[in-house]
């Protein structure tokens, strides 16, 4: 099995980021809320809020598991809201000292892992309590949406280069 030399390209699509040749139309980006990235962020925020409300309204069996799930869902929701507002109001142009694609990538990696762990923990602690079961289901759904957003935002494509000089 021979493996040829290959070129790995990674691309980051920031949804509503304007290119250098496109005109700016003020502070608010009117196109961003219609992009796939923005719609994924809104869906993630809604599912995280529903998961938080379901677990918060249930009777706590294990206080540590409830607290962990609540903290993870609220921190994840707040960070997604911050990234949504950064793209909506184009703060990435003003705050150039922060690498926004890298910080969003790290947030999605760490946040999705913690959300998945919290959903597993709360699902294992749900002893026929419908609030905890619903919270765990929405936690898993939010984890899936975060993974899908991560996959669609940071695509990795492998392109094999040809070895002939005429190309």
Swiss-Prot record:
Membrane topology category: Multi-pass membrane protein
UniProt KW keywords: Chemotaxis, Cytokine, Membrane, Transmembrane, Transmembrane helix
A matching Pfam family: MARVEL
Subcellular location(s) of the protein: Membrane
Record-level GO cellular component terms: extracellular space; membrane
Coiled-coil residue windows: none
Superkingdom, taxonomy of origin: Eukaryota
Domain MARVEL residues, every copy: 32-158
Family the UniProt entry places it in: Belongs to the chemokine-like factor family.
GO MF, any single term: cytokine activity
Protein name (record): CKLF-like MARVEL transmembrane domain-containing protein 7
Disulfide bonds: none
Any one GO BP annotation for this protein: chemotaxis
Record InterPro entries: Marvel (IPR008253), MARVEL-CKLF_proteins (IPR050578)
Transmembrane segments: 35-55, 69-89, 102-122, 132-152
Membrane is among the record's keywords: yes
């Amino acid at each position: 099995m021979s493996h040829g030399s290959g070129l790995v390209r990674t691309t980051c699509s920031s949804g509503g980021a304007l290119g250098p040749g496109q005109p700016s139309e003020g502070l608010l980006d009117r196109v961003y809320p219609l992009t796939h990235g923005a719609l994924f962020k809104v869906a993630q925020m809604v599912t995280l809020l529903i998961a938080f409300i379901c677990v918060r309204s249930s009777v706590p069996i294990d206080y540590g598991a409830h607290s962990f799930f609540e903290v993870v869902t609220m921190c994840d929701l707040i960070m997604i809201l911050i990234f949504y507002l950064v793209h909506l109001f184009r703060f990435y142009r003003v705050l150039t000292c922060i690498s926004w694609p890298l910080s969003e990538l790290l947030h999605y990696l760490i946040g999705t892992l913690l959300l998945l762990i919290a959903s597993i923990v709360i699902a294992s602690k749900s002893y026929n309590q419908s609030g905890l079961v619903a919270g765990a289901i929405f936690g898993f759904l939010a984890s899936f949406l975060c993974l899908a957003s991560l996959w669609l935002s940071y695509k990795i494509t492998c392109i094999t280069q040809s070895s002939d000089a005429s190309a």
